[in-house]
Design a protein with these regions (language model features):
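Alpha/beta-hydrolase fold nucleophile elbow
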Residues: 235-247
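Short glycine-enriched nucleophile-adjacent loop
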Residues: 250-261
């Protein structure tokens, strides 16, 4: 009887929710909303980010804007001041085919020990460029290094070159340093016993938000410690350190790139999108009457949208070399190009699209996305081919060679 009743309720819900509810609009003459969702949606739509890139800036205004972006990033990332922590410690060194694999631990907070892997090419005879490698959702430093996970249930597809970012770099002659994202890989909780690589990022993110921090703030703080350690190693060229992020890893890449101007170049392996707009246009309810939210709470940073969006941050990296491997809307990518052109180094930005959208005529080319989208419709409009989302060494290694040799 309960199952029958549930089916009836579901059917009634489906009938009640018509296509007119995909667009958020007030039914009142004064434009106000009774629905709280309508209220907050309108509030978000009215936000103009303080640090939005303006293509008509002068060179001096551009430099001042970069400083404003950096200061704003410092404010919202909320890195703690921690002193007198122990120095990082090497746990082991093992020989692999063509490179040495080291494991290190470091102590970023009084409550925390974290680990990273270092891949050092056998061909090394003098200091060489080094790449900090940050995995995507569900990934681990072991997968990036071509190693089994710390437990069988945590194994990535670690022999697949579309996964082994750090190993690919080491094989090409660069030092590669691989980290875990918080709550994943070796930094996970009970996943190794049951749910495997379906990591519970959200639990950690909730607690960090309650502490007045954020998942991205915590992630970037840890990654910054590893970046600073890299600068102290005699076999690494400190003027040629690159940050490479895959998917989720592009977010700490943007933070590190904004805060540390000594980073030489960036590998952005994901599509670029305007995240505030993404939240505004994905409004289509499902059959149960539930509207989507673009991302989980591990992507939420208080005040982020009041400051900037992803294209603004990538634009602020100019004129340092950057490669974007999975496209997005030309509107957003052109904004990045404009920043590099403004600095006189347009050649320092290289942009690729998914092969499915390599032909400009196959891409959506609009100035503003329409409201009323579900997740699949959004991805289609922003030129994303999710089945081919992987680390694109075939594009990145030639680009590195061009900028490093």
């Amino acid at each position: 009887m309960m199952a029958v009743r549930s089916s009836i309720i579901f059917a009634q819900t489906s009938e009640v929710i018509g296509s007119e509810h995909t667009i958020i609009q007030s039914e009142r003459q004064d434009g106000r909303f009774l629905s709280t969702y309508g209220v907050v949606h309108a509030m978000l739509a009215n936000i103009e980010p303080e640090c939005a890139f303006q293509p008509d800036m002068t060179a001096e205004e551009f430099r001042e804007w970069q400083h404003k972006v950096r200061k704003s990033m410092q404010e919202i990332m909320k890195f703690p001041e921690v002193k007198d922590m122990p120095s990082p410690k090497r746990l082991y060194s093992k020989q692999r085919d063509g490179y040495k694999l080291e494991k290190w631990e470091f102590y970023p907070l009084p409550e925390c020990v974290s680990t990273f892997l270092v891949l050092i090419p056998d061909s090394l005879r003098q200091p060489v460029p080094a790449i900090l490698c940050i995995p995507g959702s569900g990934g681990s430093k072991e997968g990036l290094a071509g190693e089994p996970g710390v437990a069988p249930k945590l194994n990535d597809d670690y022999l697949n070159p579309k996964v082994t970012m750090a190993r690919n770099f080491a094989k090409a002659g660069y030092v590669a340093v691989a980290v875990d994202n918080p709550a994943a890989g070796e930094a996970s909780d009970l996943e190794r016993y049951a749910r495997g690589r379906n990591y519970n990022y959200d639990l950690v993110s909730r607690i960090l938000l309650e502490l007045g921090w954020s998942y991205l703030g915590y992630t970037s703080f840890l990654d910054m410690q590893v970046l600073q350690w890299m600068k102290t190693q005699s076999y690494i060229r400190k003027d040629r350190i690159i940050v490479s992020g895959f998917s989720l890893g592009t977010e700490p890449l943007m933070v590190l790139g904004t805060l540390d101007t000594s980073i030489y170049a960036f590998v952005y392996n994901d599509f670029l999108c305007h995240t505030q707009e993404r939240a505004l246009v994905m409004t289509a309810p499902d059959k149960a009457g539930i509207r989507p939210f673009p991302n989980s709470i591990r992507h939420l940073i208080p005040d982020f949208w009041r400051k900037f969006n992803f294209p603004d941050i990538v634009a602020s990296l100019a004129p340092r070399p950057v490669i974007l491997t999975e496209g997005g809307l030309d509107r957003d990518l052109d904004l990045v190009r404009a920043a590099y052109k403004m600095t006189g180094r347009l050649e320092n930005v290289e942009i690729h699209h998914y092969p499915k959208y390599a032909d400009p005529h196959s891409r959506t080319n609009i100035k503003a996305l329409p409201e009323g989208l579900d997740r699949n419709e959004f991805y289609k409009l922003v030129n994303v081919d999710g089945a081919n989302h992987y680390f694109k060494s075939e594009l990145i290694l030639p680009w590195l060679k061009k900028h490093l040799e």
